[in-house]
Amino acid sequence: MALQFQLNQTTPQTVTTDCVIVGIYADKTLSPTAKTLDAASGGRITALTARGDLTGKSGTSALLHDLNGVTAPRVLVVGLGEADKFGAGQYIKAVGNAVRALKDAPVTHALLTLSELPVKDRNAAWNIHQAVIAADHAAYRYTATLGTSRKKAEESGLITLAIHGQETSGLTLGQAIAEGVEYARALGNLPPNICTPAYLAETTAHFAATHPGATCEILDESNMEALGMGALLAVARGSANRPRLIVLKWNGGGDARPYVLVGKGITFDTGGVNLKTQGGIEEMKYDMCGGAAVIGTFVAAVKVRLPLNLIVIVPAVENAIDGNAYRPSDVITSMSGKTIEVGNTDAEGRLILCDALTYAERFKPEALIDVATLTGACMIALGRAATGLMTHHDDLANELLTAGEHVHDRAWRLPLWDEYQGLLDSTFADVYNIGGRWGGAITAGCFLSRFTEGQRWAHLDIAGSASNEGKRGMATGRPVGLLTQWLVDRC
C-alpha cells in the first residue's frame, strides 16, 4: 500500500471520499468531526458507543458503513485512549492504527481528520507533518526481494490521504521526512548480498545525480590508502566486497560552514575473527543503518531544499573473514596518525568511523554528528525506544534532544566523563579499541571522542532504535526525523 498526501478543508459529512477517519477517547468523548458525523447520522455513532461497539481504547478501530446523512460510504472510528494522556506518542499511534486498518479495505481515497485533535505542546503544523510521517511509516511494505505474485499483492493499492487542515508547511516538511525515512528503511532492509558497499555507493550516487544541487563523490580503496585510512581498510581486508567512502554534498547555504553527518555503513558484520554466533549475526545486515539514516536525512534535506550546507559521509565496509582478515592484537594506524590496538574485531564500527571523522575535519564543520549501530551495550541500557546521545557540548546535546522530542524520535544523553577514558589505555598503541565489560556504549563514545578533538561533535548510538527485533523486524529509519528536524531548526 502506497500513500500520496494532500490537504482538505471540505465539510466532512458531505466530502466525496471513500472513508472519513475520526476518533473516540476512552471516556466515549468523540472527536470534533466524529461529533459532526454523529449529528448528521442522527446519533448513530453515539448509539454504537452506548452498546459497546466503540470503546475508544487505544489500538482499536471500527469501520462503519453507510451512515445516514454522511456522503462517504465508510467512517473509520479510531480509539484514542485516555484523553488526559493523549500526547505526541498517542497521536502518532492513532494515525498509524488508522492507516493499518485501511490496508484490506477497498479504499483509494480517505480523509484523515485526526489532525484536528489537540496534542499537548504541539501546533497545527506539527499535527499535519507528524500525521504524514506516521501514516507513511504504517503504510510501508518491504517488496524488494519478494516473488512476483506476492510483490504485486503487497504493492497494490494507492491511497490518497487527505489531511484535514491548511498548514502547507507542515505537509511539505512531513513529506520530506517521510521520504527520507522510507529511503533509509529501504536500504536497511535489503539483504547483504544485494546491499554491498558498491551497491550503497551506486544508489546514493544515482540519487545525487538526479537531484539538482546535490553531488556525490565516491572514494575507492586506492583513494583511502592514499589518505592513510588504515583503520577503515583493516576492517575491510577480510571481505571480497571492497570498501567505499561515500561523500554527499548539498550546497544550500552559500559560503556558510557545513553541517556534517557521518554514518556507519557496515553492510554486514560477521564479527571478523571474533565471529558472532546465531542469535545476533542474522540481524547484522542492519549494521549499516547509521549510514542509511544519514543518507535518508540527506534525501529529506534535498527534498525540502534546506537553506544550509550539508555533507554526509558514509564509510561503507563489510566486516568479513578470510586469511587476510585483521586480528585481535593487531596494531593499526588511523588516518589521524593515532595507533590502535585491536582488542576485538567485532568492535569494528568505531574503526571505520574514526577515519571517517578525521576525514570530515577537512570540511571545517559547523557541527559534526556521527550515527551508528555501535554497541549492544546501548541497547541493553536504553532498549529500543531511545537513541543514545553522547557529546561534550551541552548546547549541541540540548539541540538534538529538543529536535528529537519535537518529532517523537527521541534520544537520551549518556556521559562522556574522563573517568571512562582510562579503560581504553593500551600498552602497545595510543588507544585500545574496546573498554572492557562495563559501560560499553560510553567507552565506544569515548573512543570516537579521541578523533574529534576541536570539533563540535556528538555521537548517536542507534543500536536499539535502528531496527525492530526478531524474524519480522525491519529497519525503522531512525533517527532521520531527529536529524532532519535538527537541521530545520538551524535554518
From Swiss-Prot:
One GO location term (cellular component): cytoplasm
Coiled coil location: none
Keyword terms of this UniProt record: Aminopeptidase, Cytoplasm, Hydrolase, Manganese, Metal-binding, Protease
EC annotation from Swiss-Prot or TrEMBL: 3.4.11.1, 3.4.11.10
Keyword Manganese: yes
GO BP term, example: proteolysis
Keyword Protease: yes
Signal peptide coordinates: none
Binding site for Mn(2+) 2: K264, D269, D287, E348
Residues holding Mn(2+) 1: D269, D346, E348
Chemical reaction(s) catalysed: Release of an N-terminal amino acid, Xaa-|-Yaa-, in which Xaa is preferably Leu, but may be other amino acids including Pro although not Arg or Lys, and Yaa may be Pro. Amino acid amides and methyl esters are also readily hydrolyzed, but rates on arylamides are exceedingly low; Release of an N-terminal amino acid, preferentially leucine, but not glutamic or aspartic acids
Cofactor note: Binds 2 manganese ions per subunit.
Cofactor: Mn(2+)
Enzyme superclass (EC): hydrolase
Entry annotation: catalytic residues: K276, R350
Lineage top rank: taxon: Bacteria
GO molecular function: manganese ion binding; metalloaminopeptidase activity
Compartments, record wording: Cytoplasm
Family from the record: Belongs to the peptidase M17 family.
Role description: Presumably involved in the processing and regular turnover of intracellular proteins. Catalyzes the removal of unsubstituted N-terminal amino acids from various peptides.
Protein's recorded name: Probable cytosol aminopeptidase
Lineage of producing organism: Bacteria, Pseudomonadati, Pseudomonadota, Gammaproteobacteria, Lysobacterales
Name of the encoding gene: pepA
